[in-house]
Amino acid sequence: MTIETDKAPILIWGAGAIGGTIGAYLARAGRSVLMVDLVSDHVDAMNETGLTIRGPVDEFTTPIKAATPSSLDGRFRKVLLCVKGQDTAAATEALKPHLAQDGYVVSVQNGLNEETIAGIVGPERTIGAFINFGADYHGPGDILFGARSTVVVGEIDGRLTPRIMNLRDSLRHFEPNAIASANIWGFLWSKLAYCSLLWANAVIDAELND
């Protein structure tokens, strides 16, 4: 059973495939979630009609609050950064004024972005996350959730802290088997090693299951 000891509002920066899927589940579970995205049509759709998850895993629409970076106000203790790797530095600089002094940023992304984030907000305010689920942004307010997979969170210095355990509990609203690890770097590097083998699929224009 998920028992959260800290239910502070969650800011999700990047409401595409990764952020949109996680945010929808957290909102449906009753968590206070605010989505931030650069695409104004997507923000408008979420505010007006909610965020829809569809596909083989689940089908639902949930009310959710959203804002563009320029319209965002306030400071948050829990920030999930869900942008593409190449946008990490710019997004972290943009969210930094909205990060509480005792808050943290979780890199819920593909790639190794934790050091970039730590260089901007500080290592003590940076948390790593391994995700491998399948999802796609299909348009304003519309996310396709294709496949569940492992979700792991961990401090970048390997400690199993109370905030990590609480973050794990929060994410269990999305993935019931989410875990906290003292070796988040091992998970991140293993995914990078796996992805390095996928060049062959690109060369022959094949699907992953081929």
Protein language model features and the residues they cover:
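Nucleotide donor/acceptor-binding cores
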Residues: 8, 77, 149
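Internal alpha-helical scaffold of NAD(P)-dependent oxidoreductase catalytic cores
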Residues: 98, 120-125, 138, 142-210
